Amino acid sequence: MTTNLYAIAGPSKPTTPTSTPSPRSEPPSPLKSLTSLPTNPLNPQGTSTSNALTNQSSSTGIGISKPGLSVDENGEVMKVPAFLNKLYTMVSDPEVDDLIYWGENGDSFFVPNAELFGRELLPRWFKHSNFSSFVRQLNMYGFHKVPHLQSGALKNETPIELWEFANPYFKRGQPQLLTKVTRKNNRLSNSGVGSSSSLGGSGAGGGMNTRSASAAAASGSGSGQIQQAISQGHEAGNHSTSGKYLITDGTTPGSAPPSHTSAGPLIAPQTLDLSAINSGIAAIRQTQASIATDLRKLQASNEALWRQAYETQEKQRKHEETIDLIVSFLERLFGTEGEGLKGLKEAMRRGVGVRRDRDGREGRDSRDARFADDDDGGQKKRRRVGLDRMIEGGSGDGTGEHGEIESPSSDDRLVEIGSNSEYSIPSVKRTSSSSHPLSLGQLGSSRFTALPSEDPSPSGSGLGSTPYEGLRTTQASAHGAGADVNVTDPTLGMNHLSPLSDTDPLLPSSSNALAPYTSHPSFPSSNPNPSSAWAFNPSQPLLSPTSAVAAAHAYNLDPSLLQTTIGSLLQSPAVAQMFLKSLSASAQGQALTSHSHPHNPSLLNPNPNGNASTSASASAHDMNTEGLGTGSGTKDLDPTLALFSPLPSHSSLASQSNDLLKSYNDALTVGEGVDNLQESIDSLVRSMGLDLPNGGSSSVGVDVGDGSGVGTGTGEGDGEFNVDEFLQGLAKEGEGEEGEREVGGDGDASSSGAGAENGRKEDVIAQSGLK
């Protein structure tokens, strides 16, 4: 008796392969390409079922298309749960890839938007739209969520989370593995009702309670034939390409009973994974906050460093400007490019950036090094005061503002020039020494260097605009020249003073000058009007920064020549003092003072045969009396008038330019003679076996040009040794023969004889003269 297969597992109602699944009905099998079973029953003439199945399989590629059932590798009929069947269909549908789709490897599937997936896709296949229920069903069938960090995991405002689920038997293109997906259940399995049973034995995943198995048990006579037919059908199916068949049966309720092994808690493993992820995210957020804090601190520190670097650069620039101003001022002050100024530049550059210690140790060291060879304390003080006032005095023209003194120490003060402070620096035009017959190479000593000339004042045609509007005029007669000339009496501009001199202020004025160089004018006969442009102005300082230049323009002289002459004398204060005193005691100076002040016995009748120191001290006393303003107008004569020898008038200056140049040449020759005379005295003293004292004294012989030499001795040395007294003592002894040494008419050679007898020495020195 043949058994019809439809009588065992046939559908309760015919199914159409082209039917569209309703949202709440069981979907068709994923293997839609498999052909259905033949509609005709088996051969009624007694043909075996195995032959029929074999022929059908070999001819048409037989497949079993019952939904919910499948045949495993052993040919056993296995039921696929409806949930897995629906899930496989949803994931494989390309129309809903925006809601659920396979992974790249096909081992898992993704749900990009859980909320949208539960609202739109779940109601089509299930009776609910709760995504949490869907996740619980996946957990029951052994699916697990794949944890991973998304790009926006560190931000709380991310509303969408990408869900990924995987199962080792749920893969793309392999629906036959769905039979190995088992369902977890907390209830103990029952071996009786609902136990697994199969036609040929228990399967790997447990048997299935099917109507075909119960029908086979009821009809025991046909069980062998059914088992043989299914086995043959399985063998025929091995020749097909797929090898697995799903038997669709919409009437099969429920799912297969679970195996004897009980599953653990369903949610616990997933909860542990989520807590680990949350803790990791919290740690990452904390680290991110710490990094952000450190980054803000680093940015603030970077800004502070840049600001400090900018401030340091600005301060360095101001210091450089200050150093340049100081060096340029000192260059104008000293008027030299020698080694002394270079050393001063280097010392200033090294000292600007160094902050002195509070105890002044570094300042003391620098002062000791600077004055190591200086034994005179008063000279130290004068040099220090000169440098301080040189810095405080501002620019060379006396109109600049004073810079700020930053250092609290009075010894080393740094000049800090702010952005608001302005320095009025006079422009300097250096004249070449080769433009005049008197070049620097013709000077007798290396210390006689040219001073820089300042900008010339306005033209001499406008006398009212020159700085000499308030200069006084005086009238004197030069008896040596034998002619009466009108001369002016301005005090020479001595802007370029040495800081080693005794002059206290750098820029003398009526309030701070060593002596107010003022006098009651004696108007010339040609212009007796006191209200003229050359009238006396007591408020006008005679020593101004541009006095030398103004005087040169007033007399149509070369400013470089006048400044060269005066600067050559003022480079060495001792030489300048000796020169002024020599001129004051000269014959022409006596004639000048006797003509201007006939009632002054100290100036009219100096004793040429007596001690020269008495005459010099008397002249100095008159000068001091004039500076203090206690004397009358007859005592206000400036000894520097002797520099203009012969003293020219403003009107006849053009015709007397040759005489003026000759006077300048004589002045330079005097300096050379002083040096030669000093060398002669030194050689004389050494020849006598005496040691030269530190202070040293000099004996100067001056010849004003007419051949009459006047010997003057200045005892300005220390108290231990006086050359004048020594020579007078030698004269009183009267031993030896008198000798006389003639002095050449050019005035460029003067010497003293060093005979065997000491009586000659005094006469040689007294009769030495210069032309």
Swiss-Prot record:
GO terms for molecular function: DNA-binding transcription factor activity; sequence-specific DNA binding. Coiled coil: none annotated. Phosphorylated at high temperature. Its main location: nucleus. Residues 78-168 bind DNA. It is found in: Nucleus. It comes from Cryptococcus neoformans var. grubii serotype A (strain H99 / ATCC 208821 / CBS 10515 / FGSC 9487) (Filobasidiella neoformans var. grubii). The keyword Transcription applies. Residues 280-333 are annotated as: Involved in trimerization. The gene is HSF1. This is Heat shock transcription factor.
